[in-house]
Amino acid sequence: MGFQRRAAVITGGSGGIGAAITARLKHDGFQTVVLDVTEPEATVDAFVRVDLSDLDAARSAAAEIANRFAVTCLVNNVGVVMPAPLEAVRAEDMDRLMNINLRPSIVCAQAFLPGMKAAGGGRIVMNTSRVTLGKELRTLYSATKGAAQSMARTWALELGPHGITVNCVAPGPIGTDAFWRNNPPDAPRTQEIVNHIPVRRIGTGEDVANAVSFFCAPEAGFVTGQTLFVCGGVTVG
């Protein structure tokens, strides 16, 4: 039968970039299911409140959704940053970021793969980051996002025969609430950031959601194992 838009699960889909992704996939015709610790900003078909860093809770939530919905799309979006210079990186912080930024991707994929295979296809998208190319104060964050990109390429090879594609979107500077708190619009530092972006603007959650929408479309079935940088040209400028 091949891939069809049925239910899409978005981890960390309640706010920021995740909310934009959730809204776009809803617009595209998916049922949308959000796994997060806070209520979603967007209209969704189901919301499960869960701390995805808790392994047992994550497994339980994913199993619940797999039983309730025909999941053919998974967007692994949940993540935290925790910037720090190398000298200040702590082992416990490494565990925390791996448990939030990476492990839920595996837990959720394992829960939804049987349904995707039975349906004849699926879409998995990782929300990574341009920091995989290098950025100061991002030792742990870049490690987890780089691992996600490598994992996506491995999964693309394993799952391709089942009609399941696996790709990454890697945002650059995106105007989330956290970004604007740290970089007020009228601050000189913010203008410096804009001046270093070839398209001369800060990205939006919708820019990232557009890229996710492409990877989750039936027409994207011949694209897998790829990373699309949504960065306004920063990675090449």
Please annotate each region the language model reported.
Residues 89, 135-143, 154:
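Active-site loop-to-helix junction immediately N-terminal to the catalytic Tyr of the SDR YXXXK motif
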Residues 109, 144, 152:
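Active-site helix of classical SDR
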